[in-house]
């Protein structure tokens, strides 16, 4: 939803030009030999929540899955995600592709609620992973057993974050850039807040 992308008519900006969105989607599906997934938002703003109108046409373009973020573009990341329209798309009897829900999935309990109350086929976790990459393990364990994992020790968290930095450096190929890249993701981590020299 960022301005530099949406302002050019790309990304969430396509929510203002549905024919173009559908043309691009059809062209990509036709051009590649791998499954295509579309991720979009509820609409451009509160007056244009169009996801229930565009889900079927997107499916008709040949996409394999549809991921829906429960906010409009104008909301950015403010306010709460509205999952009611995601549920409406999922409950549409003409929709036969998997529906992935996204927005405010930050705890194992919320992950379970997304499946139980909104019936989605999968969830997408975003900002909750920043500084807490183990959230996937927490969610999977809770979804499988119904039990929360015990809190991890600070040392365990620090060790994971160190490994993350090492892999970032290896992936980027530059120590300074790898550290800078990692630090911005760790700002939300409880372990990171306790480490002045990290």
Model-derived features: where do they sit?
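Catalytic beta/alpha-barrel core
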Residues: 14-17, 67-69, 101-103
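Alpha/beta catalytic cores of nucleotide-metabolism and tRNA/nucleoside-modifying enzymes
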Residues: 23-26, 31-33, 45-65, 77, ...
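Glycine-rich tight-turn/loop motif centered on a GG-T
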Residues: 3-21, 74-83, 144-148
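Active-site mouth loops of central-metabolism enzymes
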Residues: 13-16, 38-51
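Active-site-proximal loop/short-helix segments
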Residues: 1-9, 69, 133, 138
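Short acidic/polar capping segments at secondary-structure boundaries
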Residues: 20, 41-44, 71-73
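N-terminal small/glycine-rich loop or linker at the start of catalytic domains
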Residues: 1-8, 29-37, 42
